[in-house]
Amino acid sequence: MPKFGKVSRQRLSTCDEKLQNIANEVIKHVDCTVLCGHRNEKDQNEAVAKGHSKATYPNGRHNAYPSKAIDLAPYPVDWEDYERFTLFAGFFLGIAKMMYPDTKIIWGNDWDGDFDTKDTNFRDYPHFEIRE
């Protein structure tokens, strides 16, 4: 059974308890890595500068503490395998819905949560966030 490494566990610990619980269930079935949890102002500005985020500090879900967002990717990470990210997102969202049916979780390739990715203009494949 896969498990999170030390760095992933540290990043995960900065996230909302629901995101931690979902990720801890997902890792039991699919090997994955936590790329990002909470982002401070410097990290958020850097993410925007690199084109990894459009939200400026303190407006990003990663900027809350605990973080209302997590960047989680199937391991090993292959940034060119978009289908794998999509498959992984479906698994993550399914686990999330089973665990927290009344919590809206949004994936970074379906920002409006309508299961239509063709209307997305900013693709952030490893990103999941809680919308309340």
Regions found by a protein language model. Give the residues of each.
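Catalytic cores and adjacent binding grooves of peptidoglycan-active enzymes
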Residues: 59-132
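Amphipathic repeat-derived elements
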Residues: 1-9, 38-47, 57-65
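Active-site acidic/histidine clusters and adjacent loop/turn architecture
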Residues: 1-33
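Extended, low-complexity, intrinsically disordered C-terminal regulatory tails
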Residues: 24-54, 98, 108-110
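Intrinsically disordered, low-complexity boundary segments flanking structured domains
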Residues: 19-23, 34, 55-61, 93-94
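Short amphipathic alpha-helical surface micro-motifs
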Residues: 14-17, 51-55
